[in-house]
From Swiss-Prot:
E.C. numbers: 6.1.1.15
One Gene Ontology term of the molecular function aspect: proline-tRNA ligase activity
Lineage start: Bacteria, Bacillati, Bacillota, Bacillota incertae sedis, Caldicellulosiruptorales
Catalysed reaction equations from the record: tRNA(Pro) + L-proline + ATP = L-prolyl-tRNA(Pro) + AMP + diphosphate
Location(s) in or outside the cell: Cytoplasm
General function of this protein: Catalyzes the attachment of proline to tRNA(Pro) in a two-step reaction: proline is first activated by ATP to form Pro-AMP and then transferred to the acceptor end of tRNA(Pro). As ProRS can inadvertently accommodate and process non-cognate amino acids such as alanine and cysteine, to avoid such errors it has two additional distinct editing activities against alanine. One activity is designated as 'pretransfer' editing and involves the tRNA(Pro)-independent hydrolysis of activated Ala-AMP.
Entry protein name: Proline--tRNA ligase
């Protein structure tokens, strides 16, 4: 492809609304343009990258025995009512009506459609197991689209669904997908951490996320360098460590704390360590209110709380509800005398003579103990921190860092097959529910995550497996007849050898061409300049920044060897 003919509108300046490197570079390199908030158009270079990622995904899905289908992005309300998710999925679902007032949604995910099809077409144990997948556009009405394609309203996903006769079969399908994901991300050049995850709105019993460590990631992950344990912050377990407390029980004492609401303010005002406080947080869980207790230096893990309560919706109570329930303004809630259910983190079990809110504005109570109020249930309800030991090996404190989720796999069990009565007839003629798994990869997110992990001050450093082109040939002066002739000869020879190659035939300064080549991240740049008088050209590796001069006669063979060596880095 000639660069003079390529639709590649690169930008010198970084758009002011682009916050992270992948967003900046995808715009600057001419890979995409924004059509509206959270909606992007992919231009030729960007679309080539997406197609290459899709092809890697497709090859590994096929290798794992999955079969590709294509579902409709538009789905009728009735499907989602059958699963029970029409009302509970939330405002992220795009809902529309046709001219006859029939309701539909633009699919944020496709469990319903796949289960419906399999229910109607698979009836016997002889037809199982099955793993079906698609690479399809998804839609989610994000409240605040941001970070380019990391959180957008329209995106491409590979979603696969397995259907098995029993849990043992699901384990096999799950392992196949797990292994396929490891291969996919290796081939894409990504360094991923595989972490235990919460199943969230998808439901099910077990889940893993494939996370790319990045300071701009929206999720936090905790992992142990000693044993390899890894989980996202929502899922990471906190040890219930019994602590012997020999303090004598003291008499409760109300203290005046005018306008002192936060733990930090209380620590300074009362000169008491944060670990001696118990925070009381009031939550609305669906249609009821509950109180949650955690130690003063801890934070409530809302995912753990939501799972414990089996709630569809969970949010902090507003100031008006807090005052109605506690009789006090926000910042002074406490467990003593509360009429709603109280759930407490396990750590609270081992505290004595702690400080809580008084349920009276501007007052707290010292020397409160568990006998002074009733706890409905103790559970692990806090976020793990870097001061906590690994819950598996107990030998080292965990490390916490941010990450970008590029893949997520779930053991769904019978959540959807039960809702849809998706059954098969076993060898004894009995009807049994199929067991499901669900497996997703964000194609656009994967591209952005690669950029976040592989870029420098000059631009993108694409792994050769997903780069839009493998080589760019750059004649320094296109008007120089000899340079132009040799450049086109090398370009055409590489094309004949099956290499994906660009030639920058623009009448531009060499510096402009070099900057664009680095910006768009082509793995190898072949420069044809004045040294052709000595029969030599330059080949530069974008990843290593190493440049080598080679004889013109052996240049094509040399470049082919470099390409093969680079591809070998990503083989599985």
């Amino acid at each position: 492809m000639k660069v003079s003919e390529l639709f590649m509108p690169t930008m010198k300046e970084t758009p002011s609304d682009a916050e992270i490197e992948s967003h900046k570079l995808m715009l600057r390199s001419g890979f995409m343009r924004q059509l509206s908030s959270g909606i992007y158009v992919y231009l030729p270079l960007g679309y080539r990258v997406l197609r290459k990622i899709e092809n890697i995904v497709r090859e590994e899905m096929d290798r794992a025995g999955a079969q590709e289908v294509h579902m409709s992005a538009l789905m009728p309300k009735e499907l989602w009512e059958e699963s029970g998710r029409w009302a509970v999925f939330g405002p992220e679902m795009f809902k529309i009506k046709d001219r006859n007032e029939r309701e539909y949604c633009l699919g944020p995910t496709h469990e319903e459609a796949f289960t419906y099809i399999v229910r109607n077409e698979v009836t016997s144990y002889r037809d199982l197991p099955k793993i079906l997948y698609q690479i399809q556009t998804k839609f989610r009405d994000e409240r605040r689209p941001r970070f380019g394609v990391m959180r957008c309203r329209e995106f491409t996903m590979k979603d696969a669904y397995s259907f098995d006769m029993n849990e043992e079969g699901l384990d096999i399908s799950y392992k196949k997908m797990y292994d396929a994901y490891v291969r996919i991300f290796k081939r894409c050049g990504l360094d991923v951490k595989i972490v235990e995850a919460d199943t969230g709105a998808m439901g099910g019993s077990n889940s893993h996320e494939f996370m790319v460590p990045s300071s701009v990631g929206e999720a936090e992950i905790a992992y142990c360098k000693a044993c390899g344990y890894a989980a996202n912050l929502e899922k990471a377990e906190c040890l219930d460590e019994p602590v012997e407390n020999t303090e004598e029980i003291k008499q409760m004492q109300e203290v005046y704390t005018p306008n002192v609401r936060t733990i930090e303010e209380l620590v300074n005002f009362l000169n008491i360590d944060a670990k001696r406080f118990v925070k009381t947080m009031i939550y609305r869980a669906d249609d009821k209110f509950v109180a949650v207790l955690v130690r003063g230096d801890r934070e409530v893990n809302e995912t753990k709380l939501k799972n414990l309560l089996k709630a569809n919706e969970l949010e902090l109570a507003n100031a008006e509800d807090v005052e109605r329930i506690t009789g006090a303004k926000v910042g002074f809630a406490g467990p003593v005398g509360l009429s709603i259910e109280i759930y407490a983190d396990n750590e609270v079990k081992y505290l004595k003579n702690f400080v809580v809110g008084s349920n009276k504005t501007d007052y707290h109570i010292k020397n409160v103990n568990l006998s002074d109020f009733k706890v409905t249930k103790f559970a692990d309800l806090r976020n793990i921190t870097q001061d906590d030991l690994c819950p598996k090996c107990l030998s080292q404190k965990v490390t916490i860092e941010r990450g970008i989720e590029v893949g997520h796999i779930f053991k769904l069990g019978t959540k959807y097959t039960e809702a849809f009565n998706c059954v098969y007839t076993d060898e004894k003629g009995e009807k049994k529910l199929m067991i499901m798994g669900c497996y997703g990869i964000g194609i656009n997110r994967t591209a952005a995550a690669i950029i976040e992990q592989m870029h420098d001050e000059d631009g993108i450093i694409w792994p050769i497996t997903v780069a839009p082109y493998e080589v760019i040939v750059v004649p320094v002066n296109i008007k120089d007849e000899q340079q132009s002739k040799i450049a086109f000869e090398i370009y055409e020879d590489l094309q004949k050898k099956g290499v994906e190659v660009l030639i920058d035939d623009r009448d531009e300064r060499a510096g402009v061409k070099f900057k664009d080549a680095d910006l768009i991240g082509i793995p190898f740049r072949v420069t044809i300049g004045r040294k052709i008088a000595d029969g030599r050209i330059e080949v530069r590796n974008r990843r290593t920044k190493e440049s080598v001069e080679v004889d013109i006669e052996s240049a094509v063979e040399f470049i082919l060897n470099l390409i093969n060596e680079e591809k070998a880095r990503y083989k599985v």
